[in-house]
């Protein structure tokens, strides 16, 4: 099971996996010891604070999988900028991995969003009809931008 999550990022370290009745909770963190300040380019190892981010991933055995990632906030001593480390397998504000979003979009492109929601929920993917519509709109918008 651990190899499944190594595909997300080679820097992802699994701390423990909790198996609930309806979901897997994967506690993890990034193994990078330092970060590069996006403002000044300085190499930073000073951690300002941490928080846990809950991100849904592809289901395993029809159970929902949640990654509980300890995300660090770095403090640049050179320019006094505080920022959060980025996760390469999800966007900044998303609660789902990129590969899960791809699966949702591929599933919903040929059927209605209501049918898609029902089908995905049966597979262990927690998603609402309105979210499916939002993902489809974002995908269409991105395709239009790349065509220009």
PLM ranges: what are they?
Residues 1-81, 87:
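Short, conserved DNA-binding cores of transcription-related domains
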Residues 55-148:
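Short, positively charged, Gly/Tyr-enriched micro-motifs
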């Amino acid at each position: 099971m651990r190899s499944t999550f190594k595909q997300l990022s080679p820097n992802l370290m699994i701390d423990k996996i909790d198996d609930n009745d309806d979901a897997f909770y994967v506690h993890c963190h990034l193994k990078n010891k330092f970060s590069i300040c996006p403002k000044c380019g300085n190499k930073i190892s000073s951690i300002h604070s941490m928080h846990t981010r809950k991100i849904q991933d592809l289901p395993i055995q029809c159970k929902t999988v949640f990654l509980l990632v300890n995300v660090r906030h770095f403090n640049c001593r050179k320019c006094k900028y505080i920022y959060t480390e980025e996760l390469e397998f999800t966007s900044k504000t998303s609660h789902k991995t990129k590969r899960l979003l791809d699966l949702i979009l591929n599933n919903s492109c040929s059927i209605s969003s209501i049918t898609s929601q029902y089908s995905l929920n049966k597979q262990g993917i927690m998603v609402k009809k309105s979210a499916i519509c939002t993902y489809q709109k974002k995908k269409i918008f991105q395709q239009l931008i790349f065509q220009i």
